[in-house]
Amino acid sequence: MNLTSTTNCLENNHISTSDQEKLVQPTPLLLSLLKSAGAQKETFTMKEVIYHLGQYIMAKQLYDEKQQHIVHCSNDPLGELFGVQEFSVKEPRRLYAMISRNLVSANVKESSEDIFGNVCCFPDKQSSQKEKLQELPDKLIAPASDSKPCNLSQRKSSNETEEISSVDHPAEQQRKRHKSDSFSLTFDESLSWWVISGLRCDRNSSESTDSSSNSDPERHSTNDNSEHDSDQFSVEFEVESVCSDDYSPSGDEHGVSEEEEINDEVYQVTIYETEESETDSFDVDTEISEADYWKCPECGEVNPPLPSYCPRCWTVRKDWLPEQRRKEPPPSKRKLLEIEEDEGFDVPDCKKSKLTSSQDTNVDKKEAENIQNSESQETEDCSQPSTSGSIASCSQEVTKEDSSKESMESSLPLTSIDPCVICQTRPKNGCIVHGRTGHLMACYTCAKKLKKRNKPCPVCREPIQMIVLTYFS
């Protein structure tokens, strides 16, 4: 993309050729800067001023390497000229204001106004005035012929149609205003950065833009061949002008046509900011105290108790879960049988002890002798014929049974002697079994009713597995 391509962008935004070629005269300081960049004249067009200004910035390498749209001019005469330390080419209003303060328009409007007045006052002499109109664009374009060669005959015809259309429709030319400024950036692989900007305030009528667009392709083709390479691309920004009707306090809202409203585009940008939700943070939980926090042994980070790892170094917390104990395999049936055969029970001590074969025989002999003694005593008691002895023996048996019952009742717990908790009549002989434990608190009949109705144990609320009828001896 070169100067011609940028000109094409400007013309597509309804900027006429006459406004592009308006001559301006820079101040002495700005003129010296432009001449150091290769300028050889004293009057320039607006496009030429910005072109040479871009060449100056590029030669001095005042642009930022990372952000090329920013120009640093604090230690340069350009900063003294504009009165700033740095500026951005993405701010066309500011750039246009800084440049326009150092420009003076050339005094070339008097001849054009006289010619336009003669055409309006003397319609009979239009044929002679057309020749003067053809000579006027030559005078305007002649100072800029060194930097931009173009087709003279094509430009004459385009300028003639523009001037006639502006004379025929002066009111329509005043009514239509241009509301946006065109600002183009051009990037080159070899030069890295340069800028050309066309800024204006007035918009011409639709007839003048149509005639100028028909005369532009040939001029674009000649300039494309003589300027820079084709490896460049342009970025165009549309911004509101300072001189437009929207910014003037006395602007007429009804002076904008429907075509201009259609051409204007509005972009809406919505920016969303992501924030951490308060529910994700552990600091909100007031139940967690400082003693519950744990310190990572690797990085020393103090972490909340909930995650099992350190969020900084991903180290798993020690003793997070208890160690799994290995279950020992159950002993086989053969080993159990061997243990039962080898071990016996000592009755008075209730301790397991191994019995030898000699001890087994002695135990058997003692048991046999005890049985014989008891039988001999019974026979002797029965052989006595006296009635007094029989009555005494019977009384002794009754007293023995009563004493045995009393001893049994004293040996039983108090809870088993009490009646059933549910019916309060029958004894507690129904044991409610659940797992390896049971509760004796009801009779067998009431306990069976609880099991049939799928009720839990009244004591521990565990599901009932079975009911066992219990006997007390």
From Swiss-Prot:
Keywords: Cytoplasm, Metal-binding, Nucleus, Transferase, Ubl conjugation pathway, Zinc, Zinc-finger. Pfam families: SWIB (PF02201), zf-C3HC4_3 (PF13920), Zn_ribbon_RanBP (PF00641). A zinc finger (RING-type) spans 420-461. Residues 206-215 have a biased composition (Low complexity). Residues 230-322 are annotated as: Region II. It catalyses: S-ubiquitinyl-[E2 ubiquitin-conjugating enzyme]-L-cysteine + [acceptor protein]-L-lysine = [E2 ubiquitin-conjugating enzyme]-L-cysteine + N(6)-ubiquitinyl-[acceptor protein]-L-lysine. Residues 370-397 have a biased composition (Polar residues). InterPro entries: Mdm2 (IPR028340), MDM2_mRING-HC-C2H2C4 (IPR044080), p53_neg-reg_MDM_2/4 (IPR016495), SWIB_MDM2_dom_sf (IPR036885), SWIB_MDM2_domain (IPR003121), Znf_RanBP2 (IPR001876), Znf_RanBP2_sf (IPR036443), Znf_RING (IPR001841). Residues 273-285 have a biased composition (Acidic residues). Residues 216-231, 398-408 have a biased composition (Basic and acidic residues). The keyword Transferase applies. Residues 22-105 form the SWIB/MDM2 domain. It is found in: Nucleus, Nucleoplasm; Cytoplasm; Nucleus, Nucleolus; Nucleus. GO terms for molecular function: identical protein binding; p53 binding; ubiquitin protein ligase activity; zinc ion binding. A motif (Nuclear localization signal) lies at residues 173-179. Its main location: nucleus. GO terms for biological process: apoptotic process; negative regulation of apoptotic process; positive regulation of mitotic cell cycle; protein ubiquitination; regulation of biological quality; regulation of gene expression; ubiquitin-dependent protein catabolic process. A zinc finger (RanBP2-type) spans 290-319. E3 ubiquitin-protein ligase that mediates ubiquitination of p53/TP53, leading to its degradation by the proteasome. Belongs to the MDM2/MDM4 family. This is E3 ubiquitin-protein ligase Mdm2. The gene is mdm2.
